[in-house]
Amino acid sequence: AITEGLVGSEMCIRDRENSLPVFDKIKKQIKIPVLTDIHNVEQCAIVAPHIDVLQIPAFLCRQTDLLIAAAKTKKIINVKKGQFLAPWDMVNVTKKISDSGNNNILVTERGASFGYNTLVSDMRSIPIMAKNGYPIVFDATHSVQQPGGQGNKSGGQREFVEHLSRAAVAVGVAAIFIETHQDPDNAPSDGPNMVPLKELDNLISQIVQIDNLVKKNNV
């Protein structure tokens, strides 16, 4: 399990003395690896000592300077495939990281734009991107996001998270990315696509069973 945080540029630069110790506290208390988004070059070196995985958001996956700066920290880099990219285009993204001396790369599938306010998950993208030699992660909650679907904010269809999670694990992935909250409808962000915390155990149990079956049969 990996827990996710979010570092905004304003918080990181202006108030990092207060914000960054939060990551240290999470690691100490929960004793699991910590992952966080980064949004600009300056954040990479600042955040890296406090986390285990630097995450490149989907919309920033083609920002060469950000990819290089993240790579130079030598941390594990989880780069999300842009909703606007074909899966075979991700080889160019990962090459920028590896050419910078870092092969600790994860690639995340999080859906593809399909008209207005919706995404679809093309499971073919998983084996296609896996051919590049890096572990593939499936982001089950952002894949059901409806960008701008509620007018002034994004919507989501959390009822499909479990279905897509099971499908991705059956195809074969290294990890599943799931956002959860004890009260998703009142979460600060991404609530409509989050899995309620009380339902997480059952979902994890399902996907672990499928994963064991897939690995047993060497799929």
Positions of PLM-derived features:
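Catalytic beta/alpha-barrel core
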Residues: 32-40, 52-65, 76-87, 105-111
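Structured C-terminal cap/extension of enzyme domains
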Residues: 167-219
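Alpha-helix-loop-beta-strand connector modules within alpha/beta enzyme cores
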Residues: 14-35, 70-76, 126-136, 164, ...
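A short acidic, helix-capping loop that chelates divalent metal ions and anchors anionic groups
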Residues: 9, 147-148, 185-188
